[in-house]
Each structure stands twice: as C-alpha cells, then as structure tokens.
C-alpha cells in the first residue's frame, strides 16, 4: 500500500515536471582557489516556463555541468511567476525593467511580429509562451542581469482587470476610455 502511494506521488511529480519547458541561458566555468591549487566547478542559468503564462529562472552551481543544470532547473521551478498576456500572445502595454546596469524595454507587438529579442530575453519569452513582442536591452549584456531585468519588467506589467480593480472601475469602462484616447484602434479584441 505504501509503495503504491509512493509510486503515485512520483508519477504526479513527473507529470508536473513534464508540463514545463526549460532553456539553458548561460553556463560558466568558475574556480575556487584552495591550498592545493584551483578547484573548478560550473554555474548554470536556466529559464523554465509552461508556455501558458508562467515562467521562472534559477541559478545552480556544482562540480559537474548536468548537476548544475539540474539545481538551476529546480530553483527556477520554485520561483515561478504568472504573467498576464493579451490574447495569450503579447503584453498588455509597454514596460521597462532594470537590474544592476542592465535595462530592458519590452513593447507589445501586433500579431505576426514574432519574438524580436536578443539572447537571454528570447529564452524568457519562448518559455513564457509569448508569441509577439519587441524587446531592447540597454547597458549591461550580462545574462544574469538581463534575465533579472526582464523579470522586473514582467512583474511591472498589469492586466486591464487589475488596473480596473485598483481604480474602482469596470473593465469595459477602462476599455472605452482607451478607445476614446486612441481613435486608430477601434477593435474590441485589441484591449482584451
């Protein structure tokens, strides 16, 4: 009976893990100086997401590359955030983020644009499930800073529902205001 329960738990864990897509962003060889010389190890930066609006990143260090990647993947799964996507494909509005000397600008894009982003940011958007976005990185090109700056920007993004709740309005009133402000945008789907 106990074995059966343990087997079921393992199956549930494997099923939960299989829903995530992980991307290795950066691997770095690090050295620890000890009395007898240098002891080498590896540091890995991994981004994990379910391609449905949840994404996380993790950092892992170990003596061997696969172990560092495994640790980073586990850390990423522990730190998942949920991002609200417009029409399930892009951002609701433009956002900026920064971490250290790394700055990123993320812009919502029309359908069919694709992911226009470099290096570490592309991995974040692909695992998040975003299909259309234009991103620009400024300052530091360090992958750790860029991933953290991208996450800072994604955390600053608000859905129309959360903005309406904060202002004490209905979502339809908020969308009506947006249509009044932008005469070129007359579609209801553009603000969904």
Swiss-Prot record:
Species in which this protein is naturally found: Methylorubrum populi (strain ATCC BAA-705 / NCIMB 13946 / BJ001) (Methylobacterium populi)
Short name of one Pfam family: Ribosomal_S5_C
Protein name per its UniProtKB record: Small ribosomal subunit protein uS5
Keyword RNA-binding applies: yes
RNA-binding found in the keyword field: yes
GO biological process, one term: translation
Gene: rpsE
InterPro entries attached to this UniProt entry: Ribosomal_Su5_D2-typ_SF, Ribosomal_uS5, Ribosomal_uS5_bac-type, Ribosomal_uS5_C, Ribosomal_uS5_N, Ribosomal_uS5_N_CS, Ribsml_uS5_D2-typ_fold_subgr
UniProt entry keywords in alphabetical sequence: Ribonucleoprotein, Ribosomal protein, RNA-binding, rRNA-binding
Domain notes: The N-terminal domain interacts with the head of the 30S subunit; the C-terminal domain interacts with the body and contacts protein S4. The interaction surface between S4 and S5 is involved in control of translational fidelity.
Subunit structure: Part of the 30S ribosomal subunit. Contacts proteins S4 and S8.
UniProt function note: With S4 and S12 plays an important role in translational accuracy. Located at the back of the 30S subunit body where it stabilizes the conformation of the head with respect to the body.
All copies of domain S5 DRBM, residue ranges: 20-83
Chain positions covered by the region annotation Disordered: 162-192
GO terms for cellular component: small ribosomal subunit
MF terms in GO: rRNA binding; structural constituent of ribosome
PROSITE patterns per record: RIBOSOMAL_S5 (PS00585), S5_DSRBD (PS50881)
UniProt family annotation: Belongs to the universal ribosomal protein uS5 family.
């Amino acid at each position: 009976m106990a074995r059966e329960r343990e087997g079921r738990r393992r199956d549930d864990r494997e099923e939960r893990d299989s829903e995530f897509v992980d991307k290795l962003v950066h691997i770095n060889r690090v050295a620890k100086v000890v009395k007898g010389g240098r002891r080498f190890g590896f540091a890995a930066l991994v981004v994990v997401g379910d391609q449905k609006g949840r994404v996380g990143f993790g950092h892992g260090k170990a003596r061997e590359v696969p172990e560092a990647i495994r640790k980073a993947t586990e850390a990423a799964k522990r730190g998942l955030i949920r991002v609200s996507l417009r029409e399930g494909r892009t951002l609701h509005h433009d956002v900026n983020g920064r971490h250290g000397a790394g700055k990123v600008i993320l812009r919502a894009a029309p359908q069919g644009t694709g992911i226009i982003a470099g290096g570490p940011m592309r991995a974040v958007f692909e695992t998040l499930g975003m299909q259309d976005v234009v991103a620009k990185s400024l300052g530091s090109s360090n992958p750790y800073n860029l991933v953290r700056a991208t996450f800072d920007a994604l955390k600053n993004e608000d859905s129309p529902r959360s903005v309406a709740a904060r202002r004490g309005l209905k979502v339809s009133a908020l969308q009506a205001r947006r249509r009044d402000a932008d005469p070129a945008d007359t579609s209801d789907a553009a603000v969904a």
